[in-house]
């Protein structure tokens, strides 16, 4: 089976040392790599719990023989922007977040 994550390693082998530098183990490099995105952040209670869920997802990926790498995008909160000019950007920010995925 052709694994996209392994094909990408062939195209850009210089990324392996960078990943090891961020805490990956050498044996993780040969596994199926799954990116797990989260909006986890400490700025408001709506996203403060998401890191726990990300770790559960990563655990499931590892149990199936893969490696789950986490990455984060912004966690805009409508509740904090209400009553300010920031609320005008709420819908636009959701589109930007969707485009990051």
Residue ranges and their predicted role:
Residues 1-101:
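Metallocofactor- and cofactor-centric catalytic cores in central/energy metabolism, strongly enriched
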């Amino acid at each position: 089976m052709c694994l996209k994550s392994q094909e990408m390693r062939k195209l850009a082998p210089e990324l392996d040392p960078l990943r090891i530098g961020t805490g990956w183990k050498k044996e993780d490099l040969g596994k199926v790599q799954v990116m797990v995105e989260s909006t986890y952040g400490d700025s408001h209670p709506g996203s403060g719990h998401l890191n726990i869920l990300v770790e559960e997802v990563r655990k499931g990926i590892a149990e199936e023989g893969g490696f789950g790498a986490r990455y984060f995008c912004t966690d805009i909160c409508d509740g904090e922007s209400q009553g300010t000019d920031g609320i005008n950007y709420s819908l636009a920010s959701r589109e930007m977040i969707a485009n990051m995925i």
